[in-house]
Amino acid sequence: MKYAILCSLLWLTHSIATPLSLSDEVFQEAQHILQTQQESHYDHKTVINESKGYYRVDCSSFVCHVLRKKSPLALAMLPIDVHHVHARAQNFYDYFKQLESVPNAHWMAVKTLFDLERGDIIAWKYDLSSHKKDTGHVVIVAEKPIQEEQTLYRIRVIDASKGKHANDTRAKESDGIGSGDMWFRVNEKGAPIGLYWSSKEKKERQHFIVMGRVQH
């Protein structure tokens, strides 16, 4: 009995003494917004009223809002395009790509998909030939990747989007902030090279994909 009590006290002491990592704080903030939002919409014009739980955001303004609350220094490192007020998906991509060769104190590159942790950020950039209006997409990792095939992993993400993922929390006719499952294809080095937005039965999308982790 005394041994069991001692073990419980040691575990409690360890839990109190071990603070959350910054990336885990990013996840917790995104999860808090997901659970407490009253209304959200996907829009490139950002309007946020936290007291009312109202969010009108796109994928990048949502992630920037989370970073602003948890790591404004890391957010300040991200480049911003001319005539824009926050980093967009392509800026996340370009910055994370640069991290692979030039790391810094605020961010680190995550080079292999199976090393992702909660709160890490995945960004991909659309090829200019696709003629898409958006520059790409950016999501926050909600759960560690689960391997389903030799080169295919399922990941639960939190994002702001128009389209829904598999097992999505967004209502049928709604968009905005939600959580759902995506699948990512990796190469022989474990780096992501393709994705399935909502179903493995649909065509795999090939994009330039990178990953980053906030550290300070």
Language-model regions: role of each:
Residues 160-216:
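Low-complexity, Gly/Ser/Thr/Pro-rich intrinsically disordered linker/tail segments
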Residues 17-85, 204-216:
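N-terminal capping segments
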Residues 72-94, 165-183:
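Acidic Ser/Thr/Pro-rich low-complexity disordered segments
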Residues 3-13:
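Sec-dependent N-terminal signal peptides
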Residues 80-165:
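...with weaker cross-activation on analogous glycine-rich loops/strands in unrelated enzymes
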Residues 2-3, 205:
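Short amphipathic alpha-helical segments that mediate assembly, nucleic-acid/protein binding
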